[in-house]
Design a protein with these regions (language model features):
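PDZ/PDZ-like groove recognition
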Residues: 70, 107-121, 125, 197-203, ...
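Cleft-lining beta-strand/loop regions that shape enzyme active-site pockets
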Residues: 116-118, 126-128, 132, 140-143, ...
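Active-site-adjacent mobile loop/cap segments within catalytic or ligand-binding domains
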Residues: 339-363
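Structured segments of extracytoplasmic/periplasmic soluble domains
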Residues: 47-55, 68-80, 84-87, 123, ...
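Primary recognition of N-terminal secretory signal peptides and signal-anchoring hydrophobic helices
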Residues: 5-34, 41-49, 167, 185, ...
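PDZ/PDZ-like domain segments forming the peptide/carboxylate-binding groove
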Residues: 35-38, 99-138, 142-146, 406, ...
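Extended, small/polar residue-biased N-terminal targeting/export presequences
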Residues: 53-116, 163-165, 169-178, 186, ...
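Stable alpha-helical elements in mature extracytoplasmic
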Residues: 41-48, 65-73, 77, 89, ...
Length: 484
């Protein structure tokens, strides 16, 4: 694992606001504040603070005055990425980059009957026997049925070493578990190998050793047989360390410029790399509107060098660079010092990066499109509540199912992605047409085979099966199986 050293390029994400940051070699800002008629501005501000503290009738607290003054200075810049961190906030910030938090080690989703356990990591929840599919209905003595997810998770999380009592429902029966909270390390790199030699790697943060984990996983996949295509999933990845993005680029490009940077003086200080390699198979980067900063650095570089094809939706557009500067009095100041461009001088800030293959319809169509493009020929999906498997592999993506009047409806774009069909929208008639090699169907607003809900067109599987010979499906009300 790479250590985080003073002077090393790194980048961070503020825990509270999910702010994305790039950190270059730390350097103290030049103390070049111009003197004004009123004297030294810093001394003047200090004098005002001291006079208010010592003479104001309310006997104000010096720390409170200082915090307000700091916040006012930062707000005057109009820059959402420049921030002051207290020591506690700095720790939260560092934990966010490393995907660490204090809790019991589960990924959850709010469902009508409680808090659904979607994934269990290594940690106290697994040791206590909590399983995927369990539903939390009470935390302590407080019901979480119908509660906002944020409220429920705040009850579950807490101080390390403390215990939380959970009431769960499993297969219709209630049971109680007492779990001790501890610091949880959520995996930042996971992967799986699909049939046809398609390897899939998901990176959720550019932590200090994410590049090493990706490299190790890639070598493991190679040892299992020839790789015909590699998918690197950066969706919802807010960034991390710039050095990690650079090292990851070396897995796919021999040498070059990672980014161009433009500082306050208009000078370009390019970040370069060498000693890389070129993979003998096509590489596909999955991105979306929450792929930001280091995710955009890597994607932009691989696009410019024709080393990868980006699939999904336009990225976030976080193209500025921050230094995190430790303060002598504790905490740190994160200051925007540069903007960056891709190797071919494409802007990123506030505009994002366009994918090479645009996909509409959300998570599952994005994933299936990437898998099909990489070489997976057919799909078998199984959905239990929100837990989805694709060709036998558990994935984090999911989709909503409507069950009404004895019919099962799925999003039209999910069905299209399963079948490899195209979706054409007719704005005049407000109808959607699905067409593949073995059939086609038109869904009109007044038709019986579709429903429009929350802006999404859902289509009846029983009706679709009459038009698409390759479609197979079954639904017992709990588990939906869908193939094509």
């Amino acid at each position: 694992m790479k250590s985080i050293r003073k002077g090393k390029m790194w980048r961070r994400t503020a825990a509270a606001a999910l702010t994305l940051t790039l950190i270059l070699p730390a350097a103290l800002p030049a103390a070049a504040a111009a003197l004004t008629v009123g004297g030294n501005p810093a001394e003047r501000a200090k004098e005002v603070l001291e006079k208010l503290e010592s003479q104001h009738v309310s006997a104000p607290d010096a720390k409170k005055l200082s915090d307000v003054a700091i916040q006012a200075m930062i707000e005057s810049l109009g820059d959402p990425y420049t921030q002051y961190f207290t020591p506690e906030e700095l720790t939260e910030f560092e934990n966010a980059v490393a995907n660490r938090y204090v809790g019991i080690g589960v990924r959850v989703s709010q469902q009508p009957d409680g808090v659904y356990i979607a994934e269990v990591f290594d940690g106290p929840a697994r040791e206590a026997g909590i399983r995927v599919g369990d539903v939390i209905v009470k935390v302590g003595e407080q019901s979480v049925v119908g509660a906002p997810l944020g409220e429920a998770t705040s009850l579950i999380m807490g101080e390390p070493g403390t215990e939380v009592k959970l009431r769960l429902v499993r297969d219709g029966a209630e049971l109680e578990k007492t779990v001790k909270r501890q610091q949880i390390q959520v995996p930042v790199v996971t992967g799986k190998r699909f049939e046809g030699g398609v390897a899939y790697v998901r990176v959720t943060s550019f932590s200090s050793d994410a590049d090493e984990q990706v490299a190790a996983l890639l070598e493991y996949f190679k040892s299992q047989g020839e790789i015909k295509g590699l998918i690197v999933d950066l969706r919802d990845n807010p960034g991390g360390l710039l050095d990690t993005a650079k090292e990851m680029a070396r897995l796919f490009v021999k040498e070059g410029t990672l980014i161009h940077t433009k500082n306050r003086n208009g000078l370009d200080e390019p970040v370069t790399f060498s000693g890389g390699e070129v993979q003998p198979f096509p590489v596909y980067m999955m991105v979306n509107g929450s792929s930001a900063s280091a995710s955009e650095v890597l994607t932009g570089a691989l696009q410019d060098y024709k080393a990868a094809i980006a699939i999904g939706t336009k990225t976030y557009g976080k193209g500025s660079v921050q230094n995190v500067i430790p303060l002598d009095q504790g905490g740190a100041l994160k200051v925007t010092v540069e903007e960056y461009l891709t190797p071919h001088q494409r802007p990123v800030n506030r505009v994002g990066l366009e994918p090479d293959i645009a996909v509409e319809g959300g998570q599952v169509p994005e994933l299936l499109t990437a898998l099909r493009t990489a070489g997976v020929g057919s799909f078998s999906l199984e959905l239990r509540r929100i837990n989805l498997t694709v060709n036998g592999h558990a994935v984090e993506d999911s989709f909503r199912v409507l069950r009404e009047g004895g019919q099962t409806y799925v999003p039209a774009r999910v069905l299209a992605a399963v079948l490899g069909a195209k979706v054409a929208w007719d704005a005049v008639t407000s109808s959607a047409k699905l067409q593949s090699q073995d059939g086609s169907i038109v869904y009109a607003p007044s038709g019986t085979g579709s429903k429009l809900q929350d802006g999404v067109t859902y289509v009846s599987l029983s009706q679709a099966a009459e038009f698409f010979r390759s479609l197979t499906w079954s639904d017992d009300g709990q588990v939906l199986k869908l193939g094509g």
